[in-house]
Every structure is written in structure tokens, then in C-alpha cells.
Amino acid sequence: MLHFKRCQLLKQIAQKCLSRIHVKTDKHPQLFLSRTFALAELRKSWHSIYSLVGDKNIILMGPPGAGKTTVGRIIGQKLGCCVIDVDDDILEKTWNMSVSEKLQDVGNEQFLEEEGKAVLNFSASGSVISLTGSNPMHDASMWHLKKNGIIVYLDVPLLDIVSRLKLMKTDRIVGQNSGTSMKDLLKFRRQYYKKWYDTRVFCESGASPEEVANKVLSAVKRYQDVASETFISTRHIWPKDCEQKIPAKFFSEAVIEGLASDGGLFVPEKEFPKLNCGEWKSLVGATYIERAQILLEKCIHPADIPAAKLGEMIETAYGENFTCSKIAPVRHLSGNQFILELFHGPTGSFKDLSLQLMPHLFAHCIPPSCNFMILVATSGDTGSAVLNGFSRLNKNDKQRIAVATFFPEDGVSDFQKAQIIGSQNENGWAVGVKSDFDFCQTSIKRIFQDSDFTGFLAVEYGTVLSSANSINWGRLLPQVVYHASAYLDLVSQGFISFGSPVDVCIPTGNFGNILAAVYAKTMGVPIRKFICASNQNHVLTDFIKTGHYDIRERKLARTFSPAIVILKSSNLERHLHLMANKDGQLMRRLFNQLEEEHHFQIEKILVEKLQQDFVADWCSEGECLAAIHSTYNTSGYILDPHTAIAKVVADRMQDKTCPVIVSSTAHYSKFAPAIMQALKIREINQTSSSQVYLLSSYNALPPLHEALLERTKQQEKMEHQVCVADVNVLKNYVEKLAQNQFIGKFSE
């Protein structure tokens, strides 16, 4: 078996040292290489590669023209290690002919087999290896390489690759037949690269080999440093030097636990990753799935979820479950206003964008020996989205993960209630509560913090509690993608050039959606202002204007927009923590005061900081209906009540000096009675599906949500449990569900 011994490394070090000789006289040159200097150089070069990857190889993978050979040489020089080019050092020496001659001689299929055999007979350690473009198409050889290497995918823009191949005068590569364009073949090959890589280097157009090499080293360092990306509670108090540091959590732990043990919410201990301008530009022509893969890979450490596995989850979540191939398209409404359509998922709301993915993240992260009960409070759309998302898990995962959804029995639309009830399945149930959303949300938090009850569930039923509300980081993170994608769509459609600012206007209740836009900005999306739109329950609007969060005298009013009828905005804590430079002590004081006294006031400096980025206003019920009516008359587009509220506030607050992206958070068919009232259609006592069919006859935009309507036909006949507003009663339901779902399996 061919093995590149470490003597190759010593040879390179010796050559490097000899380049630093001293000449004593011109007539009699003598070499002086002190023992101390030689050992120092040896230790320095040896340490650089082995401190980074140990005995493992750094394996560069990518299409022809990605720059693997050049980048590999640069990395080898930086680390002082052996560099192996599979084409030059393995294949041609094994075959005694050039690679192109071999391909011409044996053809595509036989070439792949013989290339694979040559790699299987090769071994190395502590080296930089540049693969051929076709190596990833041979499974056995890739498994062989992967055993002792970190595979780095050089993801170079397709147009750059095609241009380089033309300059290299490469007119044929493995797998290319007559009639197949180079561009199509390169697209086809991506599936193989995605299958094998451990970490990706996303190369912006025109990046130099030196820049790519530095990115590779950073990516490998991140991959090796499994403790580099941890999470803390928003109420975490930083210890003094003499005190013991409280262990931080990994991504997988934050997703599993949902809520921190001190009552706070999990946030990254370090700053959000950033993309540079070139990287963002390279995403302009990408699909939603491709954008999601790039962005989420940067936010989730591969030790928590391997990159290839994450890619599979993303493709499963967004591949066929959405009625629009663009997943979250942006539509020009009028003037400088654009609608971000977030309702093309299976349950017709923006919650699908995260809850089609989050269950797969959760199932991957949990240990195989435990059962998990997901507790969810919903103000309307979350319930059906959670039940739908977790119902799509595979059979084994559904046997160990169950969902209990609690919703205000009289606080959601008839359509939403029918949808929640109808989404019940073998591992998911819905319970109506005779109270409001805030009671449901607060009760779930209290259940999580009741150590006696959670301990009892663990002992008796082998069951651990978790959450799928936006308090769970795994639920919030995917929402960052669609805000970034919306901006990129405006660039790709030619409405703006990259770098031009935009405003976003978002109907806001629990602050999760708008917070995701804040995180998108921290990653590099040039969002200028965040416009917070409220209905007549305008707690957040008042807070943004005054810095005083006050719910002492407030009573929730029923509105046409139930999804934002919320008193305690959970994700606000995350944003205040970010603004206050991660002051956990302050978060404890503020939110304990809110719990005990039902209000808090932030300092003037924080109010000013908040108002630098945020503006807010609210909309009455009459203004909401009028906006639906006028928008339909002028554009033929029907807004749902939440989106109508955002449009009213955007009209009022945005200065029209840049585009504003209005988040459309639900399909209008979910609120048919309100739409019929707004459009002055004589309301008839009909079923929800009949009302939707009536609205569809108007041939308005957006089109009828067929998948939503189909599910509704089956939902109106189902039953559900209803309970009083008592946290102990909710506990009883949780125990009963755990018993029914898990007791047989746990006792086996």
C-alpha cells in the first residue's frame, strides 16, 4: 500500500531550513544550521499541522476548476506539511499515463472504478490531499478517505467554475457525454459533494486562492473546536474569576431543553456569524434551500448536526411540502412596498417555515433512550404547524416524541380551531383552554420550572418535557433564513442593488418573527428599520415608544388578528439581552419584576438604543378591514388581517426612501369571515371550507391554498379536549398523554 511517510514532511522542513543558510566567505561557502534553530523549525512546522488536525488529513473536495490543487499547496506551505494531489501523485503514477489519456482509453464508468481502486490502495496521515473532481462519485474510496480525514467542500460559484475550465481549455470531464453541457454536469455532481463533506468553504465569486486557503483553515479549526459555539441563558450571570463558571450548553442541548433552568431563553454565547459582501452576492442566484443550507451551516456546529445531515433535513423540510417552489417568495404590491409571502406551507402560516424543519433538528438531537413530550402554547397558527411538522417524522421518531398543544378555546378563529383540532394525529393532541394565550404560555413555563413534576414524569414514564414555541432556539433560528432570502430576492429581481437598505414591517406579538429579522441583520443583511405592527392590544408598540412594559391594567381584546394577541412577549427578552451587552443580571431583574409586578421600565440609554432601529405603531379593527378592502380594489390582492395591520402601520411609519418588505404571515383563507366582512360580502352561516370556496371565486391574489382547503374538509368533524384555566389541570393532561403514549414502550 502506498503511504506518504512523515519523512516527506521532514524533507520539506529541511528544505525550508536550508533556504535560511549563512555564507561565511565567498571563496569557501559553509552552511551553518544550528541545532536549536533546526529543532525550533521542526517543532513549529510539526505543531502547526498536528495541533490543528492531529493525524488526520485535510481533504479538499470540489468540482474541476475549484482550485483544490492551488489551495492545497498554499495550505501545505502554511502548515509545513505534505501536500498530495490525487491526479498527479496517485493516479498518474499508478497508471503511468495522464488522467485525460486514461479517461479516453477506458471511458467514464471504467475510469471511475479504476480511479476508486487507486485511491483505496493509498493511505496518508497529517497531509493536505486535493481530490479529483470525480472522486466523490465512488463511495468505497470516499469512505476510505473519510476514516482519517476532514473533508472540506470548496463551494465555488458555478459561473466561476465554467470560466476557469474555459481558460484551462478543459472540454471534457468524467461523466460528460455528447449533448451534456458543462454547466448541467457540474450541477449534477453537486449531489455527490453534498453527500461527503464535513465542512463547507463558501467561496464568493472572484476569491483568491490565498483567501480560500485561509477560509479552509478557519473552517477546519471550527470543525475541530467542538466547544467553540455554545449557548447561555439570557439570565446567565457571568461569574467572577474566583467563582466556578456555569457550563454553557451546546446547540443540541438548547434545542432539547427549550427553556433554560433559570427561566431565561437560550442565546448564542458569542456573536452571530457574519457573511461578507461577496458571500451574500453569491447567494443572490441561489434557491431558498441552497440559501438555508449555507446560512444554517454557519449557525449550527457540525458536531451537533453534521453538515450533510443538516442538508438532508433542509431538503426534506422544504422539498415538497410547500405549494410554491420558491418557498417564501417576494411579490411587489405597489410603490415601494413588497409582500413576503410566508403562507405557502402545509398549514398556511409563517410558522411552517420553521416547524417543517425544527422537528427534524429535534429528533436528531435527542438521545435515543428517552421519550419526549413537546408542550406548545398557541395563539392560533403555531398549534397546527407544530402538529403537522412532528407528524412528518419517521415512524421510530414518532414513537418517542409526542406533542401536546394548548390553545385559548375562544381566542382563535373558527378556521384556526378547526385546523388545530384536525391536525391531531398518532403522536399529537390539542387541548382547548378556557383562557387566553398568555395563560397557556405562562402555564407551560411554570410546568417546565416545576422540578417535582418533571422529575415525576421522568421516573414514572421515562419522559422529558420540551417546547416547540419560538422560545426554543431550534424553532427561532430557521426564521432568520426567510428574512435574508427576501432581501436577496429583491436584488435578484432587480429592484435594488446589493448593499442598498430596506425596511421590514412585521405584525408582532411574541417578538420572534421580528427578532429573526434582527439576527438576519447581524449576519450582514442591510436592514435599516424594523417596523413593529400591533393590533389594538398594543403592548409592544407602547414599549418601543416609551421603554415601559406595562400590563397592569391591560385586558386582551378579541381581534381579527388573534396570532398577535399577546401580553407577555417572550422573545423580547432575547433582544433586550442583545442590546444590553448580555447583561443577565438585568434580565433577571426586569423579567422577575414583570412576573411579580406586571411591568418594568428600561433605562433611557436602552430606550434610545432600541429606537435607533425600531419604530412601532398599531392599527384599529376598522383600519384593518379598510386596508383589506382598499388593497383588493387597487391591486386584486387579498391581505389576511395580520398582514393588513402591517400594511397600515407601514403606510403610516415608513418614509418611502427605501423599499419596505411587509411580512405576510398567514393565508387570508384562514380568516374568511373577516375577509368577507372587509370585502362587504354578505356573510352566510357557512362552514369554513364553504367560505373559502366563496372567496376563491373572486380569482384574487394570492391563489387559493389547495392543500389548506383539502385538510379543512376533514377537520370540521373532529373532537378535542377542553379544560379550565388551572395549571394543575394542564399538568394532569400532560401526565395522561405521557401515560397513553409512552407507558407501554417504557415498561417493555
Regions found by a protein language model. Name each.
Residues 68:
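Conserved lysine of the Walker
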Residues 77-116:
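Conserved substrate/cofactor phosphate-moiety recognition/catalytic segment
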Residues 110-148, 643:
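Glycine-rich phosphate-binding loop used to anchor ATP phosphates in small-molecule kinases
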Residues 167, 385-444, 491-498, 503-594, ...:
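Glycine-rich phosphate/pyrophosphate-binding loop at beta-loop-alpha junctions
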Residues 459-493, 500-501, 578-657, 721-723:
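Active-site-adjacent helical/loop segments in soluble small-molecule enzymes
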